[in-house]
């Protein structure tokens, strides 16, 4: 990580009033990503609520990622400067259609394959959510292992519990993890559903 990125991260953190308590020993690490700049992402109430809900769960610890304002040589969390591939879940909070194009760009910056079908390992699990899921998640379905439909606050605890238990089991089968996640109300797993083309 270059010094410009380190300086940028520290400037943002120094301006914030910390309201979140982190569970540093949490078993499920979440990279919470917003596919727009820091200022746009931090003005999203939904993004902030999800960040709080995740960090309030006893098994979870979430750090934030934003689309780089300047093209840094990679993608790193605001809190610790960790790349997204080191997390169990990469969760995208998507509010606007114009942000769709930044999702594969952010995955590329994090050295994460774009499509769910290209990611064989169960982790990091790439999940989408936000207002886009209220009307039509299909344009982004191929990118995500799972999509949270509707209000995330009601679904996240179950998701974290499933991932926590899966990790404890020592299982490495991504297919089984996706089946387990698909049993949670409000979660859509595109790989387990047929896609239709015109």
What is each stretch, according to the model?
Residues 20-22, 31-34, 76-78, 88:
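Flexible, glycine-rich loop/tail regions that form catalytic "lids" or insertion modules at the edges
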Residues 32-37, 43-44:
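Long, low-complexity, serine/threonine- and charged-residue-rich intrinsically disordered N-terminal tails
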Residues 27-31, 59-61:
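Residues that mark the start of a beta-strand
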Residues 1-25, 71-76:
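Short N-terminal or domain-adjacent regulatory/targeting segments
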Residues 34, 64-68:
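Residue-level recognition of beta-strand->loop/alpha-helix junctions
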